[in-house]
Design a protein with these regions (language model features):
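Hydrophobic ligand-binding cavity/cleft-lining segments
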Residues: 1-40
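Short beta-strand-to-loop capping motifs
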Residues: 10-12, 50, 105-107
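Glycine-rich portal/gate segments that line the openings of hydrophobic small-molecule binding cavities
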Residues: 26-80, 102, 133-137
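A general secondary-structure signal for short beta-strands and their flanking turns/coil
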Residues: 1-3, 53, 67, 84, ...
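Hydrophobic/aromatic beta-strand elements that line small-molecule binding cavities or substrate pockets
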Residues: 6-8, 56-62, 85-93
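A short, structured loop/turn motif at beta-sheet edges
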Residues: 11-15, 61-68, 91-100
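Beta-strand/loop substructures that line and gate deep hydrophobic ligand-binding cavities in soluble
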Residues: 77-129
């Protein structure tokens, strides 16, 4: 399994960042506006509409407020031929008004890592910009 880890330093408090991350039905508004266009929830299943109109179906695996950790798995609607996708976000406080957001993504087949990595890197950039802008930074 190939793994991508994004360690994102964010100029915003951990509680505020976690509140946005855990709001799984509003990622298109609170985390990655423009990168995800719309979200529809059906229980623990999230449907993301992305630019171009594709719909990605994800299972929300865990939302752990104590650990500030969200785990999810994309299971359908890939633009690239993946057989497995699992990812997690975890927020760590780093002093007043700062935190780290660790985004870990595992994919199969291994060979797809070079196609997945730029999407994750861009998503991390959009998240950082969005969260810091909302924090007034």
């Amino acid at each position: 399994m190939a793994t991508i880890v994004q360690d994102i330093a964010i100029e915003s408090g951990a509680d505020d960042v976690w509140d946005a991350v855990r709001d799984v039905g509003a990622v298109h508004e609170r985390l990655v506006p423009g990168y995800v266009l719309d979200v529809r929830m059906d229980g623990d299943t999230r449907y993301l509409t992305v630019p171009g109109g594709a719909v990605v179906r994800e299972l929300i695996v865990s939302v752990d407020d104590d650990l500030r950790r969200l785990a999810y798995s994309a299971v359908e609607g890939f633009r690239i031929p993946l057989t497995h996708h699992h990812a997690s976000f975890q927020v760590f406080p780093e002093g007043d008004g700062h935190c780290r957001l660790i985004w870990t993504t595992d994919v199969l087949p291994h060979e797809m890592i070079d196609q997945v990595r730029p999407r994750v890197v861009r998503g991390a950039q959009v998240m950082k910009e969005t969260l810091e802008q909302r924090a007034g930074r």
